[in-house]
Amino acid sequence: MAAAPLKVCIVGSGNWGSAVAKIIGNNVKKLQKFASTVKMWVFEETVNGRKLTDIINNDHENVKYLPGHKLPENVVAMSNLSEAVQDADLLVFVIPHQFIHRICDEITGRVPKKALGITLIKGIDEGPEGLKLISDIIREKMGIDISVLMGANIANEVAAEKFCETTIGSKVMENGLLFKELLQTPNFRITVVDDADTVELCGALKNIVAVGAGFCDGLRCGDNTKAAVIRLGLMEMIAFARIFCKGQVSTATFLESCGVADLITTCYGGRNRRVAEAFARTGKTIEELEKEMLNGQKLQGPQTSAEVYRILKQKGLLDKFPLFTAVYQICYESRPVQEMLSCLQSHPEHT
């Protein structure tokens, strides 16, 4: 007898979550291995007097976070998290990283023990020993195997079906390949690697570098300076991974889409760069700019810089990571944006 089709639940429905829902919804219709209905948990909001779940389920569009892109009709929005994840075989986590503890606590015990997860969340957390990856939190709280997906994937371009690549990191290769089957399309090409922790760290740390790139744009520094920010940022990403990753760190992983490609696209096209440029030019706070420019969605770069700063400070390593440190101090300690340039001029890479 054929195995029952695998039920998929997407935990999150922001800009990226909705773009991924479009891919998964279309793919499961063609693949017998997966159940044809995809549940998507939506943090309920009212938009123009209507519930967001009602808009998605009736108009098949997330008008708040992914306007202009129709979602497949087999994607069902649900506001009750416990009901959405009930009996799910495959969980796709795509929420702001600061909510992961609360979400895991709410759904632990409601998901089958054999369920598998994949996190698309770009961020890190702090534990008593320092760095804690989002995948570690999900694994520890829920007791399920978890893969990660990171890459040069600006959500609106993915939703518009423009060609891009991405990387899945999985400690159990078979599980990574299953998620590849669920997610790959002719225009969304996936490579699976086993260096999962490095893949995940790339996704978090590149947002800090993108904030630095945005500061340079705000200061009108030019392309050469921005290229230096990208290169020095990449060097700090590699150094950070070598210090804090528990397993082997392969330099080749930084050449995958999750590494240098994601870093480039985020430093030229992402919202971390855009908001950082506005921060440098207007003098407004990050919080004010989030409200104005992002519909209130949280920016990952500044928050990740704060977590990285505390982890580095605890280990006495701030002087080894001047770019990461400068981004934090400019965002949160009222240091002048011009300090971005000083940190480049005196970077230990040049001594």
UniProtKB/Swiss-Prot annotation:
Query: What GO cellular component entries does it have?
Result: cytosol; extracellular exosome; plasma membrane
EC number of the protein? 1.1.1.8
Oligomer status and interactors: Interacts with SCN5A.
NCBIfam families (UniProt xref): glycerol3P_DH
Please report a single Pfam family linked to this protein.
NAD_Gly3P_dh_N
Keyword Cytoplasm carried by entry: yes
Tissue specificity, in the record's words, reads: Most highly expressed in heart tissue, with lower levels in the skeletal muscle, kidney, lung and other organs.
The residues the record assigns to binding substrate are K122, R271, N272
What are the binding positions for NAD(+) in this chain?
G12, S13, G14, N15, W16, G17, A155, R271, K298, Q300
Role: Plays a role in regulating cardiac sodium current; decreased enzymatic activity with resulting increased levels of glycerol 3-phosphate activating the DPD1L-dependent SCN5A phosphorylation pathway, may ultimately lead to decreased sodium current; cardiac sodium current may also be reduced due to alterations of NAD(H) balance induced by DPD1L.
What is its EC class?
oxidoreductase
What residues form the catalytic site here? K206 (proton acceptor)
Where is this gene product found? Answer: Cytoplasm
Keywords of the record, alphabetical order, are: Brugada syndrome, Cytoplasm, Disease variant, NAD, Oxidoreductase
Q: Which gene encodes it?
A: GPD1L
Q: Which GO terms describe its molecular function?
A: glycerol-3-phosphate dehydrogenase (NAD+) activity; NAD binding; protein homodimerization activity; sodium channel regulator activity; transmembrane transporter binding
Reactions it catalyzes: sn-glycerol 3-phosphate + NAD(+) = dihydroxyacetone phosphate + NADH + H(+)
Specify the protein name: Glycerol-3-phosphate dehydrogenase 1-like protein
Family statement: Belongs to the NAD-dependent glycerol-3-phosphate dehydrogenase family.
Q: Which GO terms describe its biological process?
A: carbohydrate metabolic process; glycerol-3-phosphate catabolic process; NAD metabolic process; NADH metabolic process; positive regulation of protein localization to cell surface; positive regulation of sodium ion transport; regulation of heart rate; regulation of ventricular cardiac muscle cell membrane depolarization
Entry's disease: Brugada syndrome 2: A tachyarrhythmia characterized by right bundle branch block and ST segment elevation on an electrocardiogram (ECG). It can cause the ventricles to beat so fast that the blood is prevented from circulating efficiently in the body. When this situation occurs, the individual will faint and may die in a few minutes if the heart is not reset.
Classification via Gene3D superfamilies: N-(1-d-carboxylethyl)-l-norvaline Dehydrogenase, domain 2 (1.10.1040.10), NAD(P)-binding Rossmann-like Domain (3.40.50.720)
